[in-house]
């Protein structure tokens, strides 16, 4: 994963691997999705705690976000925090909130 961050006017760039997050490498073929319905199902499964390659990808991406925002000091710590949010049910609950909100917008003028 290519990772860029901005600090004190300097852009830093690094290539991070699953190992940087304390995770095992996964084959790219295991990350293939499908149509919108299948991808929604995959996202729900990952946020419900399903293990596997897709969870690894989510932990890396969420972890990178936690590092950029300063909510984690290292990629490993960030992936651990992201995993805790998934395993606690908080991530899926937030998705459900977003879904309910967006569906409420359908009827808005």
Identify the residue ranges that each predicted region occupies:
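Glycine-rich anion-binding loops and their surrounding alpha/beta cores
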Residues: 1-109
């Amino acid at each position: 994963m290519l990772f860029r961050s901005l600090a004190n006017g300097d852009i830093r760039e690094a290539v991070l691997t699953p190992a940087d997050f304390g995770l095992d490498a996964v084959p790219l073929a295991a990350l293939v999705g499908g149509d919108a319905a299948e991808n929604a199902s995959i996202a729900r499964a990952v946020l419900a705690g399903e293990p596997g390659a897709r969870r690894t990808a989510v932990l890396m991406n969420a972890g990178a976000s936690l590092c950029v925002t300063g909510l984690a000091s290292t990629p490993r710590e960030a992936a651990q925090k992201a995993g805790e949010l998934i395993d606690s049910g908080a991530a899926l609950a937030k998705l459900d909130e977003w879904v309910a909100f967006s569906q409420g917008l359908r009827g808005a003028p």
